[in-house]
């Protein structure tokens, strides 16, 4: 199976349109042993269309796409004020992201401050995202449309080396920045749940379309002005499995701390691998801690290993909660979210819930925040929690990351 464009992605280190994290390409043994919990089930419904992703497309076909605009290089040069340094809103191994302006109706470049703001991703010629991966991302976002996927407006390809992508502008940047950037304003509990629901909705949509995201992480969750979450960066996405196949085999690519243990160990990936990554992000939202924190020692260095003993015990959940919340969160809601994360992090992929079920649970949790009470069906989760002893846990081996120089700047 290939990625959304139809061939294997071999990427060493690629990052989100605004910021990224270190990737891993080494195999590791399996992670912490987790218990099996039951998550409430309901059907996932969305009125957004799911396009077929079975037929690979060439660049020539992309040029004829009715949903994407083929920008000229000069148009994007004008929109970004000649790619001026003070227009840079993000940088990574892939290249740079610039803030630009285009006319909302004609999509022609416009003066700064007029028209529609866009994010223009300009790939480095020697960057980590090759031409095929660029085509894969264009193809995926050109076919898949959902309120929780970042909108791809158009693209530009000039010669053999100049490649650009034009996205809708996400003024709040990435979730990673809000959680971990020094001096960032703390995210309130309600907003964290809102972000988790938006990301879960986008991931559930992809899984319904038989797409495995393969790179779910905080830096790939972008936020609009109202903190609505949208998934970005689809260069590693894979289609499948199809027919009687239960998984897709691929070269191990992902981000340290987020990749599911069975994927790192075997190269076999399923939608449940994305579910594991979602569990890691839930932990980040709960704790405000990095997945891998090199400033810490021992078990505290790895977020999953450190948090597991507390997730299933409602008397200990407070120990993992982000101190920046100042205790301003509902205890029962925190327990439910922790249990949901625990289920997603189950060592056995088959015992992890579907993203549609995770979404249903989080949506009901959001309703309880508005009504002020936890329903009986949701309470069953918190009462069925299981704790772990040190002997039951198996520490997650940490592979050496593929490091890159990263920085992120934002333009107001």
Curated annotation (Swiss-Prot):
May be involved in plant defense signaling. The active site is at residue 215. Pfam families: PK_Tyr_Ser-Thr. A lipid is attached at residue 4 (S-palmitoyl cysteine). The modification Phosphoserine is found at residues 219, 249. The modification Phosphotyrosine is found at residues 167, 263. PANTHER family: OS01G0588500 PROTEIN-RELATED. Residues 14-40 are annotated as: Disordered. This is Probable serine/threonine-protein kinase PBL4. A lipid is attached at residue 2 (N-myristoyl glycine). It comes from Arabidopsis thaliana (Mouse-ear cress). It is a lipid-anchor. It is found in: Cell membrane.
């Amino acid at each position: 199976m290939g990625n959304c464009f139809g061939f294997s992605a071999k990427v060493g280190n690629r990052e989100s349109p605004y910021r990224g994290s270190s990737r891993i390409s080494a195999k590791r043994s399996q992670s912490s042993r987790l218990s099996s919990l039951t998550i409430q089930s309901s059907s996932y419904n969305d009125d957004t269309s799911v396009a077929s992703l079975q037929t690979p497309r060439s660049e020539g076909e992309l040029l004829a796409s009715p949903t994407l605009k083929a920008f000229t290089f000069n148009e994007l040069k004008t929109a970004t004020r000649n790619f001026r340094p003070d227009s840079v809103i993000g940088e990574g191994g892939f290249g740079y992201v610039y803030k630009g302006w285009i006319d909302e109706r004609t999509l022609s470049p416009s003066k700064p401050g007029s028209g529609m703001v866009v994010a223009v991703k300009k790939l480095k010629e020697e960057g980590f995202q090759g031409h095929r991966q660029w085509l894969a991302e264009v193809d995926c976002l050109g076919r898949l449309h959902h309120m929780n996927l970042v909108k791809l407006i158009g693209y530009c390809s000039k010669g053999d080396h100049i490649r650009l992508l034009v996205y809708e502008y996400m003024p709040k940047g990435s979730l990673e920045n809000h959680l971990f950037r020094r001096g960032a304003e703390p995210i309130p509990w309600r907003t964290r749940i809102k972000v988790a629901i938006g990301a879960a909705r986008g991931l559930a949509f992809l899984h319904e379309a038989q797409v495995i995201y393969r790179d779910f992480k905080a830096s790939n969750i972008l936020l609009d002005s109202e903190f609505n979450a949208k998934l970005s960066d689809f260069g590693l996405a894979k289609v499948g499995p199809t027919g009687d196949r239960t998984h897709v085999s691929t070269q191990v690519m992902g981000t340290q701390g987020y990749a599911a243990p069975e994927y790192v160990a075997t190269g076999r990936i399923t939608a449940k691998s994305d579910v594991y990554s979602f569990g890691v992000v839930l932990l980040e939202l709960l704790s405000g801690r990095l997945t891998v924190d090199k400033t810490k020692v021992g078990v505290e260095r790895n977020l999953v290993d450190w948090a597991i003993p507390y997730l299933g015990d409602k008397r200990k959940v407070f120990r993992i909660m982000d101190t920046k919340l100042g205790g301003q969160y509902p205890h029962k809601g925190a327990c439910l979210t922790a249990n949901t994360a625990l289920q997603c992090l189950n060592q056995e992929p088959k015992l992890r819930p579907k993203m549609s079920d995770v979404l249903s649970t989080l949506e009901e949790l959001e309703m309880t925040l508005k009504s002020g009470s936890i329903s009986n069906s949701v309470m069953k989760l918190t009462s069925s929690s299981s704790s772990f002893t040190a002997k039951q846990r198996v520490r997650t081996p940490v592979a050496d990351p593929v490091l890159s120089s990263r920085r992120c700047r934002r333009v107001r």
